Amino acid sequence: MPVDSFFYLLLLTGFCAGLMDAAVGGGGLLQIPGLFNLLPTSTPVASVMGVNKFASCCGTVTATGQYLRRIPVPWKMLLPAAVLAFAASYLGAKAVVFFPVQYMKPAMLVIMIAMCVYTFIKKDLGQTVRTEKLTRRETLWGLFFGALIGFYDGIFGPGTGSLLAFVFVRFYGYDFLTANASGKVINSTTNLAALTFFIPQGHVVWAWAILLALANLCGGVVGAKLAIRGGTQFLRYGFMVLLCLTIDKLGFDSITEGVQQAGFARRKRFRRPLYAKIRHLSASDR
């Protein structure tokens, strides 16, 4: 690929992913496949993920700033929840080698389908603006959700923004705009936690990461402004589309991995009798 085309496509990918992530979330569904297609095939997977995480972090922080200028959020609950999410996300990244991540995809697929069905049935979900203050119990539950989703983001990742938005809408009664802004605060801290893992390990290729981050940042500004202007109805439709895309990806990955594992098991099962038969014939000849 010509160098000029590479940089143009990298900028376009970063901008579109930043716009999508700021507006409704799920920018990684676009950015990660784009990076795997654009970057040299010799690039380690960890470096691809490091470049993606650095750019996403810049875009998310910028979009968060845009939201916070216009949308009031429950800081009393968000700040401690964000701190716990940061710590849990870092622990999740460390725990990847000990945790059977392959079981996360089917579980998340079921959760995402349930969220999609629930949101579709509840037409008024996320449409009303909450005015009353949070109770002490709700604040404590916020700490639990922050730690739980932060750990999930560190160990697996896909659908984190959707989970945060759904929690704030379903369990706290916020509208989608406030839920999106609140979720961005916590998501920013989990991205920062991931960077504290990727950067010291040398997994961020700065030439690509900075360029992608600038494009992601610009897309984040545009996406946040579109979401604020579109309001809760726009975000509800965007949330539904994002859930469908995430379900499609998780479903495809689960089916593909299942077919591969079944094929490997079948080959392994049929090889053993043949190998044993050959050894038996060889022994008879002797």
Q: Model regions: which residues?
A:
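Hydrophobic alpha-helical transmembrane segments in multi-pass integral membrane proteins
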Residues: 148-156, 194-199, 246-258
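Transmembrane helix exit motif
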Residues: 62-72, 93, 101, 109-134, ...
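Residue-level signature of the transmembrane alpha-helical core
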Residues: 11, 15, 19, 53, ...
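N-terminal, intrinsically disordered charge-dense segments
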Residues: 282-286
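Residues within membrane-spanning alpha-helices of integral membrane proteins
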Residues: 7, 53, 109-112, 116, ...
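Selected transmembrane alpha-helices and immediately adjacent juxtamembrane segments
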Residues: 1-43, 129-180, 267-269, 274-276
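Selective hydrophobic functional segments
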Residues: 50-103, 107, 191-238, 269
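Small-residue hotspots at the loop-to-helix junctions and early N-terminal turns
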Residues: 45-49, 180-184
